[in-house]
From Swiss-Prot:
EC number: 3.6.1.23
An example Gene Ontology molecular-function term: magnesium ion binding
Species this protein is from: Escherichia coli O45:K1 (strain S88 / ExPEC)
Domain of life per record: Bacteria
Reactions catalysed: dUTP + H2O = dUMP + diphosphate + H(+)
Residues reported in the UniProt entry to bind substrate: R70, S71, G72, N83, L87, I88, D89, M97
Protein name: Deoxyuridine 5'-triphosphate nucleotidohydrolase
InterPro entries in the cross-refs: dUTPase, dUTPase-like, dUTPase-like_sf, dUTPase_trimeric
Amino acid sequence: MKKIDVKILDPRVGKEFPLPTYATSGSAGLDLRACLDDAVELAPGDTTLVPTGLAIHIADPSLAAMMLPRSGLGHKHGIVLGNLVGLIDSDYQGQLMISVWNRGQDNFTIQPGERIAQMIFVPVVQAEFNLVEDFDATDRGEGGFGHSGRQ
């Protein structure tokens, strides 16, 4: 298992609010919690930045972290990430902030300590462009959206 440096920025983390953990042995994502003083109510269409009380430093340029919505919040309540996916570069050292968007029809209240997003670690490959005049031909060619059909 890879070790990632984490800094607790809010003393409630690890006491009132549990540290991020994997829910099961097969979980890909660590749950991130809202490190709030008071509940925050989001009206339909509203967004807000929610602190986690944590900063990470991945340090390894072959890794990045991604913040993703929790499936139940998105499906049942319309609560997703305002930027859809949050990308954390290996050299970032600031607080993890979660952009929360209420795309649902009802007000939604985020409670202090509530699990509102998940974070996964993914491999990174930095590419170098090779300028060419043409590509080698493939069966697909320039076929784009819907090119391969629905069934």
